[in-house]
Amino acid sequence: MGYDKLEQNLIDIIKEEQAKLGFFTEDIRLYYPLSSLNHFFSAQDNTDEMQIRLDSLPDSITEKLGQIHVSHKGDRFCFHIPKEGTVYVHDNTAPNEFIHNLVELVGKHGCTMNEILNLFHTYSQNVITKKMDNGEFDLLIRFADKPEDTYYYCFKDEGCHIIYHRFLPDDYTDFNF
């Protein structure tokens, strides 16, 4: 189960990167804190235990994403995904239309929070919003009824543009926003 969650998250992040930057046949590096990896596996591994867990990824992942090299410095883990992995995601998975549209919208000059909320509502009428006053973000939006998208999307209006970051539910809870 944990490896399935890890695989899906790696693919989700690669899709998001491709929506933001375009598709390139190149290696990429994705970084995770130990706490996020422990959430995937419902574990409380220390860094050495997690490194051992990740040193031999299952064939179900490597057959798709290639021979991923995992290393860490402190509690920050780096997943070095070979170009075969980015090509696989591009060629063999459906694009995430919502992420593509969100990236396009927030990249537009003059984008508003209302436009972002309207975009969410085009994908579901069951959307949860929460105003945030933590200095980091202004608004949380998430889908209440989309098991394929459990992310918490946090937005910050920086005056001239809006930025966002998406968190897995457990990671969002860890931040204690």
Each predicted region: which residue ranges?
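Charged low-complexity interaction tracts in eukaryotic proteins
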Residues: S60-N92, I162
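Short glycine-rich, basic-tinged beta-strand/loop micro-motifs
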Residues: F23-Q44, N96-V106
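Short helix/turn-capping signatures at newly exposed starts of structured segments
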Residues: N92-N126, F167, T173-N176
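Intrinsically disordered, low-complexity regulatory segments enriched in Ser/Thr/Pro
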Residues: P147-F177
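Positively charged, polyanion-binding regions of nucleic-acid-associated proteins
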Residues: G2-R29, L102-E104
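Alpha-helix boundary/N-cap detector
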Residues: M1-N9, Y32, D45, E49-I52, ...
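A cross-family detector of function-defining hotspots
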Residues: T112-F155
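Charge-enriched amphipathic alpha-helical scaffolds
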Residues: I28, N38-H69
